[in-house]
From Swiss-Prot:
It comes from Bacillus cereus (strain G9842). This is one of the proteins that bind and probably mediate the attachment of the 5S RNA into the large ribosomal subunit, where it forms part of the central protuberance. In the 70S ribosome it contacts protein S13 of the 30S subunit (bridge B1b), connecting the 2 subunits; this bridge is implicated in subunit movement. Contacts the P site tRNA; the 5S rRNA and some of its associated proteins might help stabilize positioning of ribosome-bound tRNAs. Part of the 50S ribosomal subunit; part of the 5S rRNA/L5/L18/L25 subcomplex. Contacts the 5S rRNA and the P site tRNA. Forms a bridge to the 30S subunit in the 70S ribosome. Keywords: Ribonucleoprotein, Ribosomal protein, RNA-binding, rRNA-binding, tRNA-binding. GO terms for biological process: translation. GO terms for cellular component: ribonucleoprotein complex; ribosome. The keyword Ribosomal protein applies. This is Large ribosomal subunit protein uL5. Gene3D superfamilies: 3.30.1440.10.
Length: 179
């Protein structure tokens, strides 16, 4: 069993039950899924850029991403409906806990001038969105093989009803929020 999952069952659940006075342990919020999304603007003119992004996302997540396509045409961007413009991957279960552990303990501390993640990135429903400016913070990415520095969005979906519950859950998991 994953280190974080074990910590969740043995330490975090009892702590959250006592803090928020839940009647049942089933009310305790948990991380449902993590969605990693990357947009590839160059994909319109250069189809190889998308292949590189998919390859990097596969290395980071340990799972093959789905190619996202344009919903509608935008003439200003030379974009047609249905053109591939990005990639996303949804992690659940073991892989989700493994990725989250790696993100919190290895990747985020590698960000330049890192002072913690923003407390304001909750959406009001207990989900947290984190923008990463470069894929180089992940240990799986080889610096020499990177063709272009790409950012990505990481969305952590929880079963929490409020932002306060979700913030407490992620803090217990070791998410480094700003002071």
């Amino acid at each position: 069993m994953n280190r974080l999952k074990e910590k969740f069952q043995k330490e975090i659940t009892p702590a959250l039950v006592s803090k928020f006075n839940y009647k049942s342990v089933m009310e305790v919020p948990k991380i449902e899924k993590i969605v990693i999304n990357t947009g590839v603007g160059d994909a319109v003119s250069n189809s190889k850029a998308l292949d590189n992004a998919v390859e990097e996302l596969t290395q980071i997540a340990g799972q093959k991403p789905v190619v996202t396509r344009a919903k509608k045409s935008i003439a200003g961007f030379r974009l047609r409906e249905g053109m591939p413009i990005g990639a996303k991957v949804t992690l659940r279960g073991e892989q989700m806990y493994e990725f989250f552990d790696k993100l919190v303990s290895v990747s985020l501390p590698r960000v330049r001038d890192f002072r913690g993640v923003s407390k304001k990135s909750f959406d009001g429903r207990g989900n947290y969105t984190l923008g990463v400016k470069e894929q180089l913070i992940f240990p799986e990415i080889d610096y020499d093989k990177v063709s272009k520095v790409r950012g990505m969005d990481i969305v952590i979906v929880t079963t929490a009803k409020t932002d306060e519950e979700a913030r407490e859950l992620l803090t217990q998991f070791g998410m480094p929020f700003q002071k």
